[in-house]
Amino acid sequence: MGTPFECGVPIVVFSSQKRAMHTPENMKTHRVDGHTSRLSLESRRLTGQAGQIAQAARALYEKKGVAKTTVKDIAAEAGVTRELVYYYFHGKKEITRAVLDDYIEDLVESAMVWNENREFGKTRQSLRACVQAFRRSLYDAAGNERPMIRVIEELGVRDAFDVRAVRETVNALDACVASEYAQFHKVEIEMVYEMFCVVIFGMVGLVKLNPAITDEELMKVVEQTLHLDMEPIHQDRPL
């Protein structure tokens, strides 16, 4: 009987040693064009044929489920031979880790796209865009959960995935957003990293508890929790 748990060993959420995890030690940042004070992260998404195989597996997992997808199916979807699949991955379990890595990259990338596009000094508008990006990363326009939720729940790794997703998103926000904020605002809280974790975990739970909660209400929760300075900043030089 097909199962996402190979030989009784559950798929773990964390990357294999071949693909280092997002940690402060190995995150690679770059300066955002047009800004002297803003950083963003370099993408860690798999590319080339390995990325093509991971994307094929992801599409099949979301369409037919993990248990019903075979390596043969993945090879056919990717348009490659099974031999090539095994050249890049030891088996289905490692492919599944790559799919989970890709989901994590989606979430981190969503935060970084928001960060790169926000307008300096307009904290309220930036916060609204942040809340909207948060919703889009987990739910579609109709309020339905993204397909990745079904996949991680089938794998039985929802809690571990949530922990990793929050940690890596907060790593990114701490390195690229909090650092810039601190240059131009007084930081009114201690344990900034931990408070970011509280906010993201709290928002995920709050939206599940009350799907009808508005963006304005979520903004107020974030503003009050982080004690954000919402006054606009006017700066003569480009940042």
Locations of regions flagged by a protein language model:
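Helix-turn-helix
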Residues: 52, 56, 60-94, 98
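Hydrophobic alpha-helical connector segments
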Residues: 98, 112-143, 196
